[in-house]
């Protein structure tokens, strides 16, 4: 979070005080949230605003209105707008990844974990806000640091899938597939299905993309000595 440096000049200190006053100012006399609660609310509001208006058109005031906060409070969390997309995506993915891991830790078998992976990876419905955020971010130009963040986020999901398959192979529940190639095929299929779901392809009106993906993965992972 941006804070004034000790050697900041009078102008910077004045700006910092103004920002601090904006953060502390009540909005419609309602209590301003603080800490993790405030950051979570700001992030969720940003996801919705970006999905609705697009990355290029969204304003900090749009996010503030959705979050029920002052614009100064939003600026406190994001600083400049050019940091917005990657910060929000990183937060969204960390939140989704943590919820997946909690569910996976409670699952009894690798097969259950595989089903959870598919459910958490695919968008829930056409226009899913979290997946829309992915597409908005990918459409933007990025420097090397930004591309590394996106690579790390993608790699994290591949590593989750690898962990499930490794566990299933160790217990004899999954076939001994060549892991790098399997992950590439699995992720490519899931990404293609995600596009279908987001677009609202009619083929999925009476069928489940989740069930289709899971059946395909289970078929490839089924040990050869099982029917």
Label for each model-derived stretch:
Residues 41, 45-52, 99-106, 133, ...:
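Solvent-exposed, amphipathic alpha-helical segments
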Residues 119-162:
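Short secondary-structure transition hinges
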Residues 52-56, 107, 171:
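Short coil/turn segments at alpha/beta junctions that flank glycine-rich nucleotide-binding fingerprints
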Residues 38-41, 45, 49-83, 87:
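Helix-turn-helix
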Residues 147-151, 155, 169-217, 224-227:
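Hydrophobic/aromatic-rich alpha-helical bundle segments in the mid-to-C-terminal region
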Residues 90-96:
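Short, basic, alpha-helical segments at the C-terminal edge of helix-turn-helix-like DNA-binding modules
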Residues 87, 100-131, 182-186, 210, ...:
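Hydrophobic alpha-helical connector segments
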Residues 1-37, 225-227:
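N-terminal intrinsically disordered/low-complexity leader segments
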